Swiss-Prot record:
Organism, as annotated: Mycobacterium tuberculosis (strain ATCC 25618 / H37Rv)
One Gene Ontology term of the molecular function aspect: nicotinate-nucleotide diphosphorylase (carboxylating) activity
Protein name: Nicotinate-nucleotide pyrophosphorylase [carboxylating]
Subunit and partners: Homodimer. Hexamer formed by 3 homodimers.
Catalytic function, reaction form: nicotinate beta-D-ribonucleotide + CO2 + diphosphate = quinolinate + 5-phospho-alpha-D-ribose 1-diphosphate + 2 H(+)
Lineage: Bacteria, Bacillati, Actinomycetota, Actinomycetes, Mycobacteriales
One GO cellular component term noted in the UniProt record for this chain: plasma membrane
Top-level taxonomic group: Bacteria
Listed GO biological process terms: NAD biosynthetic process; quinolinate catabolic process
Pathway: Cofactor biosynthesis; NAD(+) biosynthesis; nicotinate D-ribonucleotide from quinolinate: step 1/1
Keywords: Glycosyltransferase, Pyridine nucleotide biosynthesis, Transferase
Ranges that cross the membrane: none
EC numbers: 2.4.2.19
Amino acid sequence: MGLSDWELAAARAAIARGLDEDLRYGPDVTTLATVPASATTTASLVTREAGVVAGLDVALLTLNEVLGTNGYRVLDRVEDGARVPPGEALMTLEAQTRGLLTAERTMLNLVGHLSGIATATAAWVDAVRGTKAKIRDTRKTLPGLRALQKYAVRTGGGVNHRLGLGDAALIKDNHVAAAGSVVDALRAVRNAAPDLPCEVEVDSLEQLDAVLPEKPELILLDNFAVWQTQTAVQRRDSRAPTVMLESSGGLSLQTAATYAETGVDYLAVGALTHSVRVLDIGLDM
């Protein structure tokens, strides 16, 4: 898929932090003691479980940082987005052994985390297949890793929500409390940022009824039951069909299809980035 400039910068920063954590107290003493300086090896990144791969370019950037571009050679690799079975070699390379072992943990931490996100996203995408609903991430990301986490969501077949606070407006309950009402908040945002897409969170059908005539780009249905979501879709379709609807809160893989079948446009899944399990990947020499 390839990393954007923003994602490349985020990857380099994450790699620098990871290597600093490993090396700030001194060099890799175990490797220096056990591996001759001239040693080279052939090694593979191997997944211990089925999943969707993401972050192999980040692995290469890690090797670049430790070994330089001439310190290793890639013999074979799969592409990000590939669905792989347990035991699959994701990438095989020849490398200077000391540098490879020094880079190993930073490389595996990032690839395992990003592949875990891609794998989880793909499971959600599979759960809603056959409906029009798309799986979308949130800003519930780990500090410093948002760009890479959102890349991994796309790699798994999901779509990205806003990247920050300035590329779209999202009116939530605290904004409503400050403005006085949900409609007042929406009008204030449109007056302040008329060129930005505006989304509004509602927590009741009454709030939905108040917002629909204003026709924001999207209405987020916060913790709606399935029957409420069905009603919201019916009202949207009859009153403001251009407005998109997103279900958020209380969703699970088990209920994803039920919500998607109501006709909403998106399911917002914060767990894709804030609490995902890593994909178990190891380095085999």
